[in-house]
Amino acid sequence: MTTREVIIPKGMENIYDTYHYAPAIRVGDTLYLSGQVGRDENLNVVEGTEAQFVQAFENVRKVLGAAGATFDDVVELETWFTDDMNALKTFLDVKDRYFTNRYPTWTGFAVKGFSMPGILVEIKCKAVLGLSDT
């Protein structure tokens, strides 16, 4: 029987308890991450475009790490951006700091906004643990 394990990194317990939001769920070797945004542990939106992108990726790293995964295990990436697509170049520069070896599939969307004012991007991904290159 395949098991379902909720992944809650240290510092994200409150969001799980309050909003019933699982940062990730592991089923077998597959890890499904919920969308991560540029908020700190106190749920404050990080100021500055690049800083917010970095924080969103650091939140992804934190969730991956809690499950024993890294960015090399990510096979699918989905990103949602606010209408200001002028920040795409900055996002690409930041993304390439995290994905340096194995590149995932990637789909990007433009949206009007997010549930919290000031959020510029949301990053969701899927990882498979124990992958090897062929």
Which residues does each predicted region cover?
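N-terminal presequence-like segments and the immediate start of the first folded domain
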Residues: 1-58, 62-75, 81-134
